Amino acid sequence: MHAAVAPIVEILTLNNGFYAKAFEKLDDEMARTQFAPDTSSITWLLAHLATSRVQIGELMGLEQEMPWDGVFAHGIAEITHDRIPILSDIKNVWGDISEAIMKRLPELEAGDLSVEPTSRFPTSENTALAALAFLTQHEVYHLGQLSYIRRLLKEPGLFKLLFLR
């Protein structure tokens, strides 16, 4: 494994655990709760993170179709309930791409990490490694949001679910 990827693997592994716990004790109706207009629900955040994982896979040369027509790729969008996926579908997309990513990460070499990504990310260098670091941090940000929303729903936060049981 390339040395630059090792800390990213650690964070993505931790994120996998947090993401799995985000589904605990939630049904589809509860997960769609929005606490104010133009705010994210748990369902929206989970789908956004699954879409982001597909982007991470793309950075590594993995090919998977962008789920849900890319509706969850950027920023909260006005979507009707009939277009919002159910939790089990979101979990499956995350699981499939995450499994492929975790297998691919140890295979990455310096040349793979220095490739210019097809999308631009808010990083000082325009490389796959910088984009991978950004998207990993992006996951952590949204996992924090998920944890907070779970607590608003009177459910335990993600840290408590993963480490304090």
Mark where each language-model region is.
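Basic/polar N-terminal segments that are highly enriched at the extreme N-terminus
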Residues: M1-A6, R165
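Short, contiguous alpha-helical
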Residues: V9-T13, A20, M30-I76, T118-R165
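Residues within well-ordered alpha-helical secondary structure of globular protein domains
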Residues: K25, H48-T51, D96
